[in-house]
Structures are given as C-alpha cells and as structure tokens.
Amino acid sequence: MPADPVPPLDPLGAAYVDLAFAVERHAPGFIDGYFGPPSVREAAEAAPTAAPADLQRRAGDLTAAIDAADLPDARRDFLRRQAVAMAATLRRLAGEAIPYREEVRLLYDIEAEQTPEARFEAAIAELDDLLPGRGPVGERMVAWRDQFTVTPEGARRLIDVIVPELRRRTETIVPLPADEAVEFRFVSDRPWSGYNWYLGNNRSRVELNTDLPIHATRLTDLLAHEGYPGHHTEHALKERLYLDHGRGEQSILLINTPECVVSEGIATLAEEAVFNPGELVDFRSEVVYPAAGLSGDPAREIAIGRAQRGLKGVDANAALLLHDAGRGDDEVVAYLTRYGLESEARARHRLRFIRDPLWRAYIFTYHAGHGLLGRWLAAAPDAEARRARFRTLLTEAVTPTWVRQAMATDPIV
C-alpha cells in the first residue's frame, strides 16, 4: 500500500474519526467531508458494521478519553461537544425516541427556541411598505424576487464577476492559501438551494440547485455563503489545524454536530463581513446588474433584504410545528407561505428539507448561528476588532458555548 499523502492521525483524532465512519454506516451523509489519510477511510470501510448500541459505548469511551487527555481548553470543549452529538445520533439510531428540542440541544449545543410571530408580523409590515405594487405581501414578495431570476447560463456569467471580488475582499480579513480553488456546478433534485462539498487540499465543489429560481439579487450572498468568506474559506483554513498542528479531528467534517452552528453562522454572515451596505449597493449597481442585463434599485432591494432578516426564524418555527407539535404537512406549508412569504412550491421544498431524517434538526443551525455569532461580532468595539473576531471564527475550532462565554467576558480577540 502506498504511503498516505497527509500526516497520520493522533490517537484521539483517530478514535474520533473511526467513530464517525462507524456512524456513517447507519446514517449515510453524516460525514460531510474527509481529507485525512486514505488508509484510515479504507480500514474503517472494511471493518464489520457495529450495532448502534455498541457504538454508544465507543462514544462513551471517546468522551472519557477526551476528559482524561492533556488538551487545551478550546480543543477539549470542541471534541467533547462533538462526541456528545455523535452519542445523541447513536441513541436515535438505536431506536430511542428523543424529544425534538432535546435532540437539537444535544446535537448543536444550542436551544431550539421559537421566534415570536410578532417579530415576523413586524417584518412583514415593513416589507409591505417597501415592496412595489398593491395586494397581498406574499404575492408581491414572490413577484419581486422573480423579476431578478437568471438562467444557469446567466448565473455562470455572474459567478465569474462576483467570486473574484469576494475573494479579494476576503483576503483583507485573512490570507488564503495560494492554491485554493472552488469549482461551481449546477444540479437538480436536491433538498437545498446550494451546497459546498469541501474536498480537502484547499479545494471545494459548490453545487447550485436549479430546481429553485436563481435570483441575481441573492447571488452575491449565496456565493459568499458557500465560498468566500463562507464555507470554502473556513474549511480550507481549518484544514491547517490538522495539517500543521496535528489535530486529527479537523480532517473530517460532520453533519449534526455543534461545528455546524459555527459554520452556518459564518456563512450566513459572510456577505456582510466583506461588504458594508453602501459598498454592496455600489457593487450591485455597477457590476452585478450590468453583467446580468438587469436594472433595479439596489438601495431599495438591500433594504428589502434587511427587512427579510426579520423572517429568519420562520423555518425553525415550522420545524417545531412538524417535529415538536406534530402538525401535518399542509399546516406547516401554510405557515411557511404566511410568515416566510414563500410560494407554495418553495414552501414544499423547505418542508422536504426539514422532514429529511438527516436534516430534520439542521434548520436551527442557520438561525441560531447567525444570531449567536452576529451578536458577538456586533459587540466588537470597532471594525478592526470585528474583522479579528471573524478571523478567529474562520481559523479556530470553537463551539457555540465558546462563543457564549466569549460574549460573557467580552474579549477583544
């Protein structure tokens, strides 16, 4: 067998990775990416499939080993909370019925909080004033979005002008590896609108789902989310924790663990991390719209986008209706159309995501991640401190608890 092209895993990292591959046998898709030694993957895939109950015991052994090891506090916190999440997944795989809110807490180190509908009503009232035309706000919202729809070919042209600017601005926050790269592809029949597959060695493949309309007004945000300074940037920089610092757990990316809250928080804040509102207006009006052959009012559209942030908790509330309150599909779709201002087709696509066994709790990572990380960044005393905090999130493996503690002590990072 040829030598592995990357460093070996440390014992604790190896135990963590082995357990993750064992969980993947029962929950396909649990591993979002692996870029450690190929021999470790090959050995794990060749091993007999262990029962979830046996894997629960291994998760307990891993937690005990983490507690006994001489580790920096931040690494211990990361490993321990990831192990707790794996143990919770194994409990469900073993047939245990975990209440939905407890499941969210164990998987993600956050609470499954319901957003008051009064907040949605206030956002909808603001949108009623901002959106052109007359009639129901939801219909006007859909019509407003649809006027900015571009074809996949048009989106490809926009990618070519948007991504270089996002990358340039990202490098004002943190240096990027010289050989990093992202490939963009268009796909269909997926439960999400866009997805980053991190391949290791500073490479990503980003897939955009053509089942859903691609809007020029949202494309900068989507590309920032998936690429610069979002998922691709974070994964490329955190891979260095494995390659340069021997942290084997950073050779693998796992779904349904606390790292997802931080990752989605980074991604949902990515566009505003590199553009202030005035810069975004200028970029859209001077670069994006001419390239798309569109005309518009970027200042108004950005104001509409800001008002839409008040609807960020709608999907999470819908998930609570479905999984916690036991409401039916039609009621959940009606909730999404009423408060999310979605078309019925798009609402049913959202329902597909929150009903999927792998993704059923994941919806909380977006809302909670944006809120938690956004509050910490907003509390920084100045723009340079905000950039430093965002850089920390991109380069250090931290948990939601770490961010909450950082806010409590308010360090200048």
Where do the language-model regions lie?
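N-terminal maturation segment of proteins
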Residues: 1-413
